[in-house]
Amino acid sequence: MEVLMTNESKAPAAGGAPKKLSARGLVKRFDGKEVLHALDFDVLDGEFLSILGPSGCGKTTTLRILIGLLMPDEGTLTLGGRDITTAPPDDRGMGIVFQNYALFENMTVRGNAEYALKFKPELKARRREIAQGVLEQLGLAEHLDKSVRQLSGGQQQRVSIARTLALNPEVILFDEPMSALDVETRLSLRLELKRIQREFGTTMVYITHDQEEAFALSDRVMVMGEGSIHQLAAPDEIIANPADDYVADFVVKNLRIKMDSLARFMDR
């Protein structure tokens, strides 16, 4: 089954990969208070980048600026060299997967995957084919005509991911998509996301407060605290050389605790 996405010689990002998404000097203020402090970062083509931090660190505000739900007070965003700073969400070349699935409960699995394609008239003739293709790739072939209410939480999240993939976005943003799922389902979905990234070279930006999840999934991790970037590096580099005491305490120490807990779960 042919789908819209292709994997033409794309591979997960390496150190020499070109920049896909660039932020320069991003500042955001609410009621006069600055909550993002001149953020500078790049997301490389085909990489999996996690933005990691506790509640209130600015990661969700950053996500909302990336997708276009908020405008920065200062700074610029470019995607593939195109300035998207003030572009509306549907003209940014990005897709988003939410924590709460955001599915239409009165529709079937297939209907949910097809829904976003209804706003792409040039794809009208292939809408059903594209939706079915991505659903099959995510292991949902047996559930196409079921109501999404009949699915488990993990299956519903797969439908949400399939709906985003069907649009073939240049970048997929994930807003803590696994926080409501049990441990086994989360582990399974991690494998799915890494497979998608590997097979299609999809650029992914993943928002999370979970250290173990970020380090298991990511090519690089951007550690945020109080509206600033404390470190942006590969997981091994952060563990070996935390940039400051904040990174050492929030990431490294907590990661070791979580890894010990996961090991005990896997040994059951």
Model regions and ranges:
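The feature captures the beta-strand-to-loop junction immediately N-terminal to the Walker
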Residues: L52-P54
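Conserved ABC ATPase signature
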Residues: S147-L151, Q155
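Conserved ABC ATPase "signature" region
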Residues: D83, A125-H143, K194-R195
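ABC ATPase "signature
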Residues: L232-A233, N241
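Conserved ABC ATPase "signature" C-loop
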Residues: E226-G227
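Helix-to-loop junction immediately C-terminal to a conserved catalytic motif
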Residues: I67
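A short, proline-enriched helix->beta-strand linker immediately N-terminal to the Walker B motif
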Residues: A166-E170
